[in-house]
């Protein structure tokens, strides 16, 4: 009995480039069209944008709305100074994700419960988080409303346009980062493909590198949803975010091994420009040869 013949793996074709969540699926984008690659990127970018919108809508928007309702009727930031008629230390609203606090005396005694705490002090705004604090003085050139009567209608009218702008900025920034990082990873893909005897062009390596970053972006979208539901705390979210950076490197290093081999492509090529099955029939060696016609003889044979 003869062992069953194993057919070589077929080279990946653009029709297979539809999911970038496995090394083989990412490798398929090396031979896909730019349009197909951009469409898949757009789908993942929209997934990330909608996840971010959902997180902001669930975790931050209710806190901002409640904080505005707790503001006094009169309040203003004028000439770089907060004019506040309420308590000098007052927590306007908070949850586990965000806290808004007024601390005119800069006592910092309000406690730190939320992942991000925004303190409005007498002359500056302070952002406090696990990595430390960042502050910015109020711009003395402008006046800002800090009261319920003005901020309530403004927030009600501009909440959704602001969220839409955040979503648009997220999609655009993701495309810029993906294609920029792909330029950085493309030489690595080309180098790995060379030593692994795999065939890929520079454009193909660029598209493959761009597709290799999509699994990490999907992981960020999942982390946002899990953090919004409270399934992971801020530390868990930070670990997942760090893992998404590692995922891009892993897929860029493993996907080139699923590209078609040089030997497989060479076996399909014919030096005369056609495949053997498509070319003329091969002449038998026993068949008599037809003598070549002399180009200097006349048609009558003389």
Where are these regions (language model features)?
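Hydrophobic alpha-helical transmembrane segments and adjacent short intramembrane/lumenal linkers
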Residues: 150-269
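Juxtamembrane inter-helical linkers in multi-pass membrane proteins
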Residues: 10-24, 189-202, 267-278
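Short, highly charged, low-complexity non-transmembrane loops/tails of multi-pass membrane proteins
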Residues: 261-297
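Long, solvent-exposed extracytoplasmic domains/loops
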Residues: 61-152
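Intrinsic disorder/low-complexity segments
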Residues: 1-2, 281
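Internal alpha-helical transmembrane segments
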Residues: 2-68, 222
């Amino acid at each position: 009995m003869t062992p069953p013949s194993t057919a070589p793996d077929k080279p990946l074709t653009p029709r297979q480039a539809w999911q970038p969540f496995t090394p083989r699926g990412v490798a398929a984008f090396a031979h896909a069209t730019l349009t197909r690659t951009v469409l898949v990127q757009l789908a993942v970018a929209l997934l990330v944008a909608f996840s971010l919108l959902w997180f902001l809508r669930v975790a931050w928007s209710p806190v901002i709305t409640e904080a505005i309702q707790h503001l006094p009727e009169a309040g203003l930031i004028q000439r770089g100074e907060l004019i506040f008629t309420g308590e000098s230390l007052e927590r306007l609203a908070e949850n586990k994700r965000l806290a808004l606090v007024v601390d005119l005396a800069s006592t910092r005694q309000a406690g730190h419960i939320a992942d991000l705490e925004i303190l409005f002090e007498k002359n500056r705004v302070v952002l406090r988080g696990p990595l430390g604090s960042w502050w910015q003085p109020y711009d003395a050139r402008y006046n800002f409303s800090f009261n319920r009567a003005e901020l309530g209608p403004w927030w009600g009218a501009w909440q959704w346009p602001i969220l839409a702008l955040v979503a648009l900025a997220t999609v655009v920034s993701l495309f810029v980062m993906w294609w920029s990082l792909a330029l950085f990873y493309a030489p690595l893909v080309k180098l790995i493909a060379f030593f692994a005897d795999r065939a890929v062009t520079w454009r193909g390596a660029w598209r493959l590198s761009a597709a290799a970053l999509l699994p990490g972006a999907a992981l960020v979208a999942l982390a946002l949803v899990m953090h919004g539901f409270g399934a992971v705390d801020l530390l868990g979210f930070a670990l997942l975010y760090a893992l998404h950076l590692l995922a891009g490197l892993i897929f860029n290093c493993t996907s080139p091994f699923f590209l078609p081999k040089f030997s497989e492509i060479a076996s399909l090529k014919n030096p005369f420009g056609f495949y053997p099955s498509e070319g003329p029939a091969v002449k038998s060696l026993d068949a008599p040869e037809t003598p070549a016609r002399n180009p200097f003889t006349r048609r009558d044979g003389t």
